[in-house]
Amino acid sequence: MALFRKKDKYIRITPNNFLKGSVSHNVPEVPDELFAKCPACKHMIYKKDLGLAKICPTCSYNFRISAQERLTLTVDEGSFQELFTSIETKDPLRFPGYQEKLQKAKETTGLHEAVLTGKAMVKGQQIALAIMDSHFIMASMGTVVGEKITRLFELAIEENLPVVIFTASGGARMQEGIMSLMQMAKVSAAVKRHSNAGLFYLTILTDPTTGGVTASFAMEGDIILAEPQSLVGFAGRRVIETTVRENLPDDFQKAEFLQDHGFVDAIVKRTELRDKIAHLVAFHGGGQ
C-alpha cells in the first residue's frame, strides 16, 4: 500500500441535484416566430414592426423575402397570371438526395421551382415577370429555372411585353452539373432576341445575387436596379482574395459598391420599387 497519494489536479465537485432541477421552471418561453434578429445591426425586432416589406426599423436592412411576398408588394392585386407551372426537374444525373431536397423545398416554399414566372400588371402597366426565391435551394439555377425564364422572354417577344426580373441566387445548381451551366448561355440568348425586338428588360438585384445568374441575365438588363446592401457578385470574397492576393474593401460586392463602379444604375428602397418599375416601363414604351 502506498504511503503517499498523488495530489488531484482538479477540484472535485459533487453535483447539486437541487439546483439542477430548479432552474427556469417558471420562466415563460418566447415563441421564435415573435422576434427576428437583424443580420446587419444585430437588434432583436418584434416581427410586426418589420411590416409587410420586412425592413429593419433600426438600420433599414432589407430582410430576404419570399417570391409570394415580393409579388404582393409589387403587382396590382389580382393581376398575376402564373405561367409554366408544368415544367419539372427530371434529375438527369440521378444525384443522391436531390429528389428529396426538391420535395422539401416545394413543401417549404409552396413553389414548383426556384423562380416564379408569369404576367402581371404594375400600376396599370402589363409586364412579363420573374421572381427568384432564395428559400428554394438558394434559388440555384437548374434546367427548369433556365427553361422557365427562357420561355418568359419568348412569350414577351410574342406579346410585345417588357420583362422584369427580381434576381436572387447562389449560382448554378450543382446537382444538375453541366446542364445547369448551359442555362447561362440559353437565357442570355433569349435576352438578346428580346432586345433585338426592341423591347425593354429591367433587372432588380436582390440579396443575394451570385454565381452564374450574376454572370448572365442578372447583369444584362437595359436598366439594372438593386435593393440597398444586397450582396452581388460572381465568386466568393475569400476565393477572390486568395486568387488576387489582396485584401478587398469591406463593402466589396455590396450594391452600393457596384453602383459606385458603374455596374448598377440605381439603388431603390424596397417600398419604392413598385412606383419605380411602373415609371420605367411606361417611359420605355409601356406594356399595354
UniProtKB/Swiss-Prot annotation:
Pfam families, sorted: Carboxyl_trans (PF01039)
Positions annotated to bind Zn(2+): 38, 41, 56, 59
Organism: Streptococcus pyogenes serotype M5 (strain Manfredo)
Biological or metabolic pathway of the protein: Lipid metabolism; malonyl-CoA biosynthesis; malonyl-CoA from acetyl-CoA: step 1/1
Gene of this entry: accD
Principal location: cytoplasm
Zinc finger motifs (C4-type), residue ranges: 38-59
Name of the protein: Acetyl-coenzyme A carboxylase carboxyl transferase subunit beta
Protein location: Cytoplasm
